[in-house]
């Protein structure tokens, strides 16, 4: 099992989330790998957080480093993506939900174009209606863009965007309505869905249970919980069947 959405670090409001808590959750719930990013990138400074995240992941190889990018303070997209890819980050993340900024900007599109060249996957929260607006002006892309924190109320925008763009993937954490996972699988294929918990800010188990207690075929569950992420972030084959099959 691979968790594509974990965090650590301090917030300005007094919370302190430890990467040790992520590791403990991985041991408890049999998670093989977890993508992890630093809240310092969201609240303080992305570049300053990069060395810290890489150091944590070197010490704990089952943690895979995700860089945080702040669209308010990033004016060299090509240099940024090249630096992150060269340093060993497996993906880059936009903290749009914390920074209260829109993806519908020329700078995001420039960063996505640079990520396309180097095939650096991108993760981003996108409020309802923003996904299509942000991506519409762009040409065809193949670099994986993973939409975080979506829910059933966003389906009208997200599913439309995913039909148009085969490089879009969806974290399933917010899809806890009855039969919603079966609905998503029917419309996108299980190869476009990924397990992410947002631990330790949120609990890991409820998100895993969304998959485990669904009526999906076992092979679909394995794709969502493990195989899709392995193909995207570890370059392992066996997931990402993009058609609704």
Each model region followed by its residue ranges:
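Active-site gating/metal-coordination segments in enzymes
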Residues: 32-33, 44-121
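A general structural detector for well-ordered alpha-helical segments in enzyme core domains, enriched
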Residues: 21-25, 49-56, 79-84, 107-111, ...
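Mid-to-C-terminal alpha-helical segments outside catalytic/metal-binding sites
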Residues: 2-4, 8, 12, 16-33, ...
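Conserved, mostly hydrophobic/aromatic
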Residues: 5, 26, 53, 84, ...
């Amino acid at each position: 099992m691979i968790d594509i959405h974990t965090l650590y670090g301090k917030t300005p409001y007094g919370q302190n989330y430890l990467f040790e808590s992520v590791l403990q959750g991985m041991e408890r719930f049999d998670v093989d790998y977890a993508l992890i990013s630093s809240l310092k990138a969201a609240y303080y400074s992305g570049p300053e957080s990069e060395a810290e995240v890489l150091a944590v992941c070197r010490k704990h190889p089952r943690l895979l480093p995700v860089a945080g990018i702040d669209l308010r303070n990033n004016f060299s997209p090509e240099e940024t993506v090249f630096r992150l890819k060269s340093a060993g980050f497996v993906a880059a993340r936009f903290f749009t939900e914390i920074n209260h900024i829109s993806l519908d900007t020329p700078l995001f599109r420039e960063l996505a174009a640079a990520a396309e060249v180097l095939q650096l996957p991108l993760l981003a929260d996108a409020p309802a209606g923003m996904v299509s607006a942000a991506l519409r002006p762009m040409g065809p892309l193949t670099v994986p863009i993973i939409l975080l924190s979506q829910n059933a109320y966003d389906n009208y925008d997200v599913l439309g965007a995913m039909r148009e763009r085969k490089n879009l993937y969806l974290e399933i954490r917010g899809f806890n309505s009855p039969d919603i996972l079966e609905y998503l699988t029917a419309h996108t294929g299980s190869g476009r869905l990924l397990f992410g918990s947002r631990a330790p800010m949120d609990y890991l188990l409820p998100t895993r249970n969304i998959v485990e207690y669904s009526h999906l075929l076992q092979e679909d569950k394995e794709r969502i919980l493990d195989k899709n992420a392995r193909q995207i972030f570890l370059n392992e084959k066996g997931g990402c069947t993009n058609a609704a099959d």
